[in-house]
Amino acid sequence: MRSPSSLALLGKKRFLPLFVTQLLGAFNDNLFKQALVLAILYRIGSTVDANVLVNLSALLFILPFFLFSALGGQFGERFEKSRLIRALKLWEVAIMTVGALAMWFAHLPLLLLVLFCMGTQSALFGPVKYSILPQVLDERELMAGNGLVEMGTFLAILGGTLVAGLLMSSERYAILVAASVLAVALAGYLASRQIPLARAPLPELALDWHILRQTRQILRLGFGQHRSVSRAMIGNSWFWFLGATYLTQIPAFAKGVLNGNETAVTLILSVFSIGIASGSMLCARLSARKVEIGLVPLGALGVSLCGVLLWWHASTFSAAPQVLGAWGLLAEPGARWILLDIFGLGLFGGIYIVPLYALIQSRSPEHQRARVVAANNILNALFMVCSAILAILLLAVVGLSIAQLFLVVSLFNLLLAFYLFRAVPEFLLRCGAWLLGRTRQRVRGEGGERIPAHGAALLLARHERWVEVLLIGGAMRRPVHFFTTDVLSPPSRLLRICGVSALDGEDVQLSGRVAGLMAAGELVCLLSREPARAWQVLQGRAHGLAVLEIELREDGPRSRILHVTLAGAVDRESP
């Protein structure tokens, strides 16, 4: 059955107001920030160097994410979320009122202060925005919801940047910008009033106002989550490292490599943003209405491939002697390949990031989710600062070209992907299962509700062929640790990359790894050609453990049924 379009979520009252609220917030942030940068460069005179002020603006906007994300995470646990969002949006109206006056009077220090306050408001809003999604959407809608949010965010970034340029080109720029930011802030507040109630997960939480201590504690909380969540945070932050690198270098790349003007820069930024929006939307269709982390390896590989192609096409591009605008750039055959590479970067970036956000949300405990998102936001800000430092070192100190910088970060992306998938083999396992389901075998479940959503359980499965591991792993909604009592054949050795381990001997209770996983409440699957015999060995030792038997049955040439039955459960009081 075909999954409904993710756009259908925009017709639901529980999601649309939140989507509009966050979209208008991102739009207003970038409208004001870009207008301020253009005002510094072209409109407001100052004794301080303009480049210093532009970089100071970037610092003032990102600094609050280090300082106040932890506080935003606490707010998201302590207070009812819809009410908290309304309060934050009302604060945005107040900030933009001051910003409108500062723009009208061309008061640079006040404009910079307003930018810092906008960054603070965004830092507090971020943890609430992402942690409320699992409360207003069910798990089957998380991929679509995150895809829409990411699409809206990047289109809002693009839209705010473009509108700021249009408004600042007018002689009446001050009144136009002032009226626009205030109107958008008011519209965002009105939209937030329609967000449904989302109860506070931890209303008894005592707020800690000590910024450094709370930031350290929340980072410790984030990295103390299940390995899949903590490593997803690193993968998520790496995406923002890449995004910051490309977005920062695109203007200089367009001018220095393509000999393009301002409209060429706008074209490239538009292509990149539309690519991310397209990839984000595509995730919902590819995921079949579940949190499909198997898309992450495909996204990572695509990002590196497009990055290498961008370096190759840029290195062989012969710039025209005259300065090119957007239409002139489109007329150049070599430039069209470069634009296609940039679109691919955005497309695969969207496919990469959406499942990571959904994984963090779905596998974080509800009473910690906002703080885990806050930890992720702090890490995002750190990675973006590191991207700027690396770019300065490679461009100014090492002397690389911008195209060579793109090649370096593409190769770094492969290294990060290797680390991520080695640390969490489930990514590769689910990727293999997803590819298999799309090309050869589809699996539908029967009795899957018997598998507990949380806590330890043992699955017994007959193991005949290596593809069965992929089919079983892909059908599960939670991480599975696979062990086999059989000798791995050469094709099956590839499954070790996906985290399948071989056990020596039949008594798996003697395995320290299995015992440790069970004690930690994990889901373990024992693959054996004789699962009944393995169950006989376990029966006297698996105290308090739910044991289920899995069987893959043929259901047509390209379809199987994953049948789950209760093999047994041993009473915790048994001797």
Name each model-derived stretch:
Residues 35-46, 100-105, 158-181, 256-257, ...:
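Transmembrane alpha-helix termini and helix-breaking/packing motifs in multi-pass membrane transporters
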Residues 175-193, 404-418:
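Symmetry-related core transmembrane helices of the 12-TM Major Facilitator Superfamily/SLC fold
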Residues 78-92, 285-305, 400-402:
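Cytoplasmic membrane-interface "Motif A"-like loop-to-helix N-cap segments
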Residues 129-131, 135-136, 181-208, 314-317, ...:
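Helix-loop junctions on the cytosolic side of multi-pass membrane transporters
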Residues 90-106, 301-331:
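C-terminal ends and interior cores of transmembrane alpha-helices
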Residues 442-575:
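Soluble catalytic domains of membrane acyltransferases
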Residues 2-16, 197-234, 257, 323-330:
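Juxtamembrane intracellular "pre-TM" segments in multi-pass secondary transporters
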Residues 16-33, 57-95, 110-169, 184-185, ...:
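Substrate-agnostic recognition of the 12-TM MFS/MFS-like secondary transporter fold
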